[in-house]
Design a protein with these regions (language model features):
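PTP/DSP superfamily signal
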Residues: 102-153, 161-173, 177-179, 183, ...
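Flexible, polar/low-complexity N-terminal or interdomain linker segments that lie immediately upstream
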Residues: 1-47, 117, 121-166
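Structural scaffold elements adjacent to functional motifs in cytosolic proteins
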Residues: 36-38, 53, 175
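Thiolate-centered catalytic microenvironments shared by cysteine-dependent enzyme domains
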Residues: 1-8, 51, 56-141
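Helix-loop module immediately N-terminal to the HCX5R catalytic loop
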Residues: 26, 30-31, 54-79, 194-228
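Local beta-strand N-terminus motif with an aromatic residue
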Residues: 32-34, 50, 75, 172
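Conserved beta-strand elements of beta-rich interaction domains across eukaryotes
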Residues: 7, 14-17, 40-44, 60-61, ...
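Short loop/helix-cap segments at secondary-structure boundaries that form the rim of catalytic
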Residues: 44-52, 167, 182-191
Length: 298
């Protein structure tokens, strides 16, 4: 029998971020990246499900079957959801299905907290009726910015900053452009833009812009407006500003802020110069440098 330790609740924002990881292509195109299982009825699944989910099938006695054509032992994330399971103490479809999967899966099975109902209320644009995905269609799946503070703070790249649908879906009301190019196309329509003209080099001084960036983000988030921080690739410059903001607003030590952003976006990577500047910023905001940046982790 499986132990409950093999199941872990997964917040809607965590699944949203898993769905939106990308390198050159969406990570969803990697065969061993994500197995997303919908444990609801066939009728509910056909009506609408979370994008790329497959239906968990049952035998004639209503026992869940392992998904076919998925090598579960190799998959990095396995997420199971039903209509609205909200705790691991329930006995609904998501828990029953997860227990079957947990017998062969080597990591904890993630059970989506609040199920399809909560997820689709937050992220209506990730509802789908599509059942079969061709590999090329998944490769072309355009990822959305990563969510750092649910509904309020997003981290993205230039393409996402210029995508009208993304702005509308995430209700982006302000953005911070951390790159040398002032964007001419879409961001001129986003009236609230802060441009920080810095290039991704160890010699760039981003520290001198931290206060202005943090105050700008704070001002907009204070009115419950969503803010997108972006740079060309969304990996170094913009993630540095987001980490600086978490130190400023949440009073996180650099280590906590770093871990938070890394959990949301595992390929984020501020350059060495920016790491030193974040360490100075930690000292300015918190009055101490508690994070040892010589640690190879940074």
């Amino acid at each position: 029998d499986t132990d409950m330790a093999d199941l872990v609740l997964c917040k809607p924002t965590e699944l949203y971020n898993i769905l939106n990881q990308s390198t050159k292509f969406s990570r969803l195109a990697e065969p061993n990246y994500l197995c997303l299982l919908d444990a609801r009825s066939k009728r509910e699944y056909n009506e609408s499900h979370i994008v790329t989910a497959r239906r968990a099938k049952q035998d004639k006695d209503e026992n869940y079957l392992l998904p076919e054509s998925v090598e579960l032992e190799c998959v990095r994330y396995c997420v199971v959801y039903d209509g609205n399971t909200a705790s691991l103490n329930e006995t609904g479809p998501a828990i029953k299905c997860s227990r079957v999967v947990a017998q062969v899966y080597r990591y904890p099975v993630l059970v989506l907290e609040g199920g399809y109902e909560r997820f689709s209320a937050y992220y209506h644009f990730f509802r789908s009726q599509k059942v079969f995905w061709m590999p090329q269609e998944i490769e072309e799946f355009l990822s959305y910015p990563i969510e750092i503070i649910p509904g309020l703070l997003y981290l993205g790249d230039q393409r996402q900053a210029n995508d009208r649908h993304i702005h509308k879906d995430l209700k982006i009301n302000a953005q911070v452009n951390v790159s040398l190019d002032p964007e001419k196309n879409l961001s001129s329509e986003v009236h609230n833009e802060l441009h920080i003209p810095v290039m991704d080099s160890c010699d760039s001084d981003l520290l001198k812009f931290f206060s202005r960036a943090c105050e700008f983000i704070d001002k907009h988030m204070g009115t419950n407006s969503a803010v997108l921080v972006f740079s060309k690739l969304g990996i170094s410059c913009s993630s540095t500003v987001v980490i600086a903001y978490l130190i400023y607003c949440k009073k996180y030590f650099l280590k906590e802020a770093w871990t938070h952003v890394l959990t949301c976006k595992p390929n984020m990577r501020p350059n060495r110069g920016f790491v030193k500047q974040l360490s100075e910023w930690e000292n300015i905001i918190l009055g101490q440098q508690s994070t040892d940046i010589a640690d190879p982790h940074y």
